[in-house]
Amino acid sequence: MLTFDNRFLRELPGDPETSNQLRQVYGACWSRVMPTSVSSPKLLAYSHEMLEALELSEEEIRSPAWVDALAGNGLMPGMEPYAACYGGHQFGHWAGQLGDGRAISLGEVVNRQGQRWELQLKGAGVTPYSRMADGRAVLRSSVREFLCSEAMHHLGIPTTRALSLVQTGDVVIRDMFYDGHPQAEKGAIVCRVSPSFIRFGNFEIFAMRDDKQTLQKLVDFTIDRDFPELRNYPEEERLAEWFAIICVRTARLIAQWMRVGFVHGVMNTDNMSILGLTIDYGPYGWVDNFDPGWTPNTTDAAGRRYCFGRQPDIARWNLERLAQALYTLKPEREIYDEGLMLYDQAYNNEWGAVLAAKFGFSAWRDEYEPLLNEVFGLMTQAEIDMTEFFRKLALVDAAQPDLGILQSAAYSPALWETFKPRFSDWLGQYAQATLADGRDPAERREAMNRVNPRYVLRNYLAQQAIDLADTGDTSMIEALMDVLRKPYDEQPGKERFAALRPDWARHKAGCSMLSCSS
């Protein structure tokens, strides 16, 4: 049986009203809310790694009582469901109160190692923060969130996790592209897991409302529970050090997104974790043909605010909004300027280390920058697959560089032929730089393969899993969970999961373009 220790409820002010009725909630960090039951829950998938972390057995999670709990139809001992209150800047503008509109936390589990895991159901029904929505989630978006949460973890990227995927047996109406064509889709619920789901927006809402008392309580609680290393810091220094840690963690997170070609798609401040975790897997995508301007989110297609190449700048902008909120408690500008400067330094250091590792150099040198910028430009113009390119680059013999090794990363044979001479020139320069670096070739190859994944959750693969799951077949979900456990290994016999995006998927909904509809 799990041990719950629901500190968020116990130590922070709550909403006195207990109904699920839509409302503005003031002076409270959370509202008690019961999940809305579903008709016929069915457990489709679960994460073995999260079961182990929570100290749950497969027998337990498959039991009717646990399936009911994961579907919102019942509670296990110690569970106290609630929805959190927060606001946020969305696409650069303050959006007011947002909150958990369809996510309902069940409580905080503490395992025998003392690790704290908050369990949260996404798609479990209406809360006071649902605005005009129904509080539900569709199978399509739930499969994507379940798969990507665990895929990112195995890539070594800080992330919230996923315990389970449950089909509800109910129909949910969604207009996938907001074009006036709503359709009935199957409902589902993901149980997300994280040490904390606190976001930048949790702090912003109280600052915007000039509720300094609640804001201070939330800051003190967050530091005490989630940043124990700061408990003994002098009070006058604690907030500055805390903000600095958040800035550095965020910088490192974004550099890791960029390393593997992950595009979040909707980096609003309510989707930014205070712990520096990847949170809220909505219209995310993985870069296929390299393009810094690519965004998977149709809502962002015109402005490309959240495109691949802008993610570092957007993260900094979001940190500025957090600084703005904290300034109401401690109006000392230098604290926040120092934190933001640390973000810049941490990102540049981490990104330099990422680039050196991806290209197989022993360390970053500024002299590499023109060489790397040139190939990124070539990859964009020639439509070169990012994941395949870096994996094959590890096979290049610097003493006898063979351009043919890289050809499998090209989507267009015609474009490859056009840019082949320039790639050949670049490869010669790269080989010279590699030889000058003096690294052992075998060591270089192994090091590159540790940071350049063979397998990522390509957009079309996720869509194939969704299409099959819609027919009741979860085999693709299971196959992807299996192969993505070891994304840096070759895994003979599983090469099809590393295949480039096929032509049919280039403009297919769910494969190249997604919306916030979920």
UniProtKB/Swiss-Prot annotation:
Mg(2+) binds at residues 271, 280. It is an enzyme of class 2 (transferase). InterPro entries: SelO. ATP binds at residues 99, 101-102, 122, 134-135, 192, 199, 280. One of its GO terms (molecular function) is ATP binding. The active site is at residue 270. Its cofactor is Mg(2+); Mn(2+). Keywords: ATP-binding, Magnesium, Manganese, Metal-binding, Nucleotide-binding, Nucleotidyltransferase, Transferase. Pfam families: SelO (PF02696). It catalyses: L-seryl-[protein] + ATP = 3-O-(5'-adenylyl)-L-seryl-[protein] + diphosphate; L-threonyl-[protein] + ATP = 3-O-(5'-adenylyl)-L-threonyl-[protein] + diphosphate; L-tyrosyl-[protein] + ATP = O-(5'-adenylyl)-L-tyrosyl-[protein] + diphosphate; L-histidyl-[protein] + UTP = N(tele)-(5'-uridylyl)-L-histidyl-[protein] + diphosphate. Disulfide bonds: none annotated. Signal peptide: none annotated. Its EC number is 2.7.7.-, 2.7.7.108. Belongs to the SELO family. Nucleotidyltransferase involved in the post-translational modification of proteins. It can catalyze the addition of adenosine monophosphate (AMP) or uridine monophosphate (UMP) to a protein, resulting in modifications known as AMPylation and UMPylation. PANTHER family: PROTEIN ADENYLYLTRANSFERASE SELO, MITOCHONDRIAL. This is Protein nucleotidyltransferase YdiU. It comes from Methylobacillus flagellatus (strain ATCC 51484 / DSM 6875 / VKM B-1610 / KT).
